[in-house]
UniProtKB/Swiss-Prot annotation:
Binding residues annotated for [4Fe-4S] cluster, in chain numbering: 429, 435, 474, 478
Protein name: Sulfite reductase [NADPH] hemoprotein beta-component
Organismal lineage: Bacteria, Pseudomonadati, Pseudomonadota, Gammaproteobacteria, Alteromonadales
Catalytic activity field: hydrogen sulfide + 3 NADP(+) + 3 H2O = sulfite + 3 NADPH + 4 H(+)
Co-factor requirement: siroheme; [4Fe-4S] cluster
Organism whose genome encodes this protein: Shewanella loihica (strain ATCC BAA-1088 / PV-4)
Amino acid sequence: MSDQKLSVNEYLKTDSNYLRGTIEEGLDTSLTGAFNDADQQLIKFHGFYQQDDRDLRNERKEQKLEPLYSFMLRARVAGGVCTPKQWLGVDKIASTLTSSNSIRLTTRQTFQYHGIPKRNLKTLIQDLDREALDSIAACGDVNRNVMCNPNPVESKLHQQAYYWAKKLSDNYLPRTKAYAEIWLGDDKVAVSESEEVEPVYGKTYLPRKFKMAVAVPPDNDVDVYTNDLGFIAVAEDGELVGFNMVAGGGMGSTHGEVATFPRLGDDFGFIKAEDCLKFAEAVLKVQRDWGNRSDRKQSRLKYTIVKHGFEAFKAEVEQRAGVKFEPKREVVIGDRGDRYGWIKGVDNNWHLTLFIEGGRIKDLPGQPLQTGLREIALVHKGDFRMTANQNIIIAGVAEEDKAQIEALARSHGLMGKLISPTRGHSIACVALPTCALAMAEAERYFPDFMTKVEALQEKHGFLEQPIVIRMTGCPNGCARPFAAEIGLVGKAPGRYNLYLGASFEGTRLNKLYRENIQEAEILAALDELFARYVKEREAGETFGNFTVRVGVVKAVIDAAKDFHG
């Protein structure tokens, strides 16, 4: 590949001195609340994005002011596990260093802050560091936060799976000292041209973002097939023996560009647990060397596999790993939702899953959620565990402490509200007003929209049955809308593309049903489909499977050919 073909980002990475760029100079500049264009790309590797308040954009323009710039910072928390002490630190940061005064749980089992002024960035990162937390590689062209079923004390198998998720996270962190130098005040280290700073990533890192997940069947809460690389735990007599490996998933696409599409990962076969890191590193290095560095819209692993072919990619991974895949083991992939309320673990401790609407932890009228979790953290002796459905688990509660934890949860509006199965299975991205890519609302609008969907379900007599519904403000797919039975993807203010037909378990994508429609049209379409579903469904048939069986949409078997066709 010639230099002329490289995307701008590749030059930026090459010239960045291993992600340093001119970030420090940008921090010292008080003339603007922003970083320059090049550093805006590099700061992603440090865990944050530059944003502005889009609700105020026109008003500030009229006042001849620059946009109200702020930053969204995402933490790296493998498997979503943190201690009560860490949670108190996370909470204090939200209350003192951000304008949103909130904590946002993400669809990848971590938390993020919105509304951070540039002047607060260094203090915030240093405060996180004091809690043994960081934001390294939470964004950027690297392996991002590794997901795992969030309750590793539910069984021995969960503990073993979490161990490997943590190893995957730690092993594939960038090795550059840029983060420590810029944010934590570590001594600067001169880097020679011959020095191998990044043994896995190299000087230009990966062509694009890379996402990993570890699933523990029958749960598929981590949506393992939507990841670049997924490991599905295989057990014998309750002990982890290895994983079925899947690779090539990814949700992002671009409206109107048929060369871009979401995709679910391919099944590659079974690997022994002790070979997990060999295969992970092999996949990363093949993607590093084979991935498209010219067109970032074609740079994800899914396009690399489609371009080179499954068999060629598999053979290269085996060659680099030095181990061959065994035939895939049979496992059952089931529910993607969280189990709300109390669950008892094998160690006789209890785990309380709390529903957090939109993942937004903030004190609301009659629901002081943030205060409630703070009060719980002050007395809780176990862990906090964030889920891929934007919820939180108070894990490791002793029998004698249950009543106190439940009383705190109920008195602060964290328990007691009846949640329908569909609402409990549904998620939305942040979108407006902070996300620069959003074309329509998601988080702010989704609760009211879900109330209207619930009314339709009640009208047709199946409110007790869950449907996986997801909404995003754009087609980048942060809330994994293309793997939802009903997916709504923002097209313009108040307008969405409506997708139908994904499987309930997350093993089949959905397909476009109606394009660029408003709420009234969406609800009318669902009203009609719900009526048909109740009359024509087969025993135990999920809504997504029904829409495919009766021909409302065609099944997506090969995304490269079927998703747009």
